[in-house]
Amino acid sequence: MSQSRQFKFGKDPSFTFKFLRRSAPNGSLHTSASASSWWLALARNAIYFALGALGLTSEDEVLVPAYICAAAVEPIRAYGAKPVFYGINKDCSADLLDIERKIGPCARALLFVHYFGFPNRNIRELRSLCDLRNLLLIEDCAHVLCGETDGVPLGQLGDVAVFSFRKFLPIINGAELRLNRQVESMSIKLRREAFTSTLKHAVNLAEQRWPPISSAIKPLSNVAKFLHRASSQQSQEGPAQQAEVLHGNSETRFDPGVLYSPMSRLSRWIMAHTDMEAVVERRRDNYFKLADALHEISGVEMLFPKLPAGVCPWTLPLTFEGLSYVHKLLRERGIPAVAWDAVRPQELGGAQFHDADFLYENLFFLPVHQNLEPHHLDEMVSVIKNVRHSTRSRPLARNLG
């Protein structure tokens, strides 16, 4: 079932001219890569290359938070390093004592996350700890479009940083690997994007932007797909190396076939011409309005009740007191709520981390993206009120999974 038929509105932003500028302004957010950064298809690919840039080997361990999407763990395993999980508290802060316990003789790096676009609560302590224990710091900014902490922009505190722009923009793919320290040598030989791939992306975007014309351009779509398949089959690299990642892909596995895929031309163009300030302003405004309304609902607890200046939220994360897997109830009612219960890393079974288990089972995320209008926010609040009312008489901690 398509997203438009299942939900009352989209989980992710769709393409619109409203947030485009005619020319790419100088100095805007994330408009160009540099000698110390690379534009890639996926953030998980950036994590893989980050390990190589930092000189890790297959004998090294990477400390990883126990609350994380499996897509961020798979590249560590694929690289050959060993992920070692550390505890996360219910407010998404790091269990610093558990980190200390997990630093063994093979520990080489520590990965931390700026959850949902908000500065990590322990960033200074983690930086100091890594400096003290001679660990490399990997800053996962996959939920970040912009923001700072103590005057330092997010993405500049780790030895490397990883961004995922397709979480914020209506693009096919798009991620960045940023190096903040000198390395002996770093070269990523990305494949050139075939014209047929660019054409296919353009057709997909047109179908997304104007669904009624899908039937009219179906012949063009079929031609684009045929040419792309033919190009892949004729390539010396083989079809597996011509694989693509499309916007909205929920796969968490690490696919070597797309490892050397660049950020697409169309994605780069949209990103360069997007009015980032307008996107940030709309997302912040939606967050403020939604948070104000949710404050009035008994039993609803937001992970971040306040939105700091300069932060661009990815989503609005929250829990229902005493009720697990609420996102499933909301999705049944047409609200595209999301949770990480289905993307928990395979190693995290058996109640090893109780607070992380709570987050996987109880924390869910509401969209606040730039395409949402006031009536969409009102719809979310109305459904949440109804769900809260209908579950108020149920036993506490009821499991809906």
Tell me the role of every PLM-derived stretch:
Residues 1-57, 79, 278, 386-392, ...:
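Conserved PLP-binding active-site segment in aminotransferase class I/II-type PLP enzymes
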Residues 12, 34, 38, 68, ...:
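PLP-dependent aminotransferase class I/II
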Residues 45-46, 68-70, 91, 116-118, ...:
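Short, solvent-exposed loop/turn segments at secondary-structure junctions
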Residues 50-105, 330:
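Conserved PLP-anchoring active-site segment centered on the Schiff-base-forming lysine
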Residues 76, 130, 154, 294-295, ...:
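A generic structural signal for well-ordered alpha-helical segments
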Residues 91-189, 197, 369:
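Active-site phosphate-binding strand-loop segment of PLP-dependent enzymes
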